[in-house]
Amino acid sequence: MAQMTVQVVTPDGLKYDHHASFIHAVTKDGQIGILPGHINLIAPLEVDELKVRRVDDESHVDWIAVNGGIIEVKDDFITIIANSAERDRDIDVSRAERAKQRAERVLEEETKRVLEEATKSDRNDDVQRAQIALRRALNRINVGTKIR
């Protein structure tokens, strides 16, 4: 059976290293499915889930919450470099829920302030940071609650 090697690397080191028969990722240009023999490519990733179907068991899928980064496909070797990445089994869903609630609260407060003071650009930065924090929390919750 044809296979690929998949590695997920963060500033904290190697987070994932397995052989796969299929990978699904979400890039800035949309969703991508990768099979062995895929053309070489480099693409920026969205904050989203990464699905890896393992070679050792076709029914086994590893889910990884990836917070942006890039994916490189070269000769059946897939490297994902991300600021952070967590496997579904490692995600503390209750912690992610709390992060989601904090981000939603900040977004609501900052959106009100921005509407009141539309000329302040620093408020827009706070809103953008809160939106990113919310996307990351939702991604972690989504991956952390996958049926195992």
From Swiss-Prot:
Naturally occurring in which organism (per UniProt): Streptococcus thermophilus (strain ATCC BAA-491 / LMD-9)
Function of the molecule: Produces ATP from ADP in the presence of a proton gradient across the membrane.
Name of this chain's protein: ATP synthase epsilon chain
Membrane topology: Peripheral membrane protein
SUPFAM superfamilies cross-referenced by the UniProt entry: Epsilon subunit of F1F0-ATP synthase N-terminal domain (SSF51344)
Signal peptide: none
Keyword Nuclease: no
Location(s), subcellular: Cell membrane
Main subcellular localisation: membrane
UniProt keyword annotations, A-Z: ATP synthesis, Cell membrane, CF(1), Hydrogen ion transport, Ion transport, Membrane, Transport
Subunit composition and interactions: F-type ATPases have 2 components, CF(1) - the catalytic core - and CF(0) - the membrane proton channel. CF(1) has five subunits: alpha(3), beta(3), gamma(1), delta(1), epsilon(1). CF(0) has three main subunits: a, b and c.
Stated family: Belongs to the ATPase epsilon chain family.
GO CC, any one term: proton-transporting ATP synthase complex
Transport keyword on record: yes
GO MF annotation list: ATP binding; proton-transporting ATP synthase activity, rotational mechanism
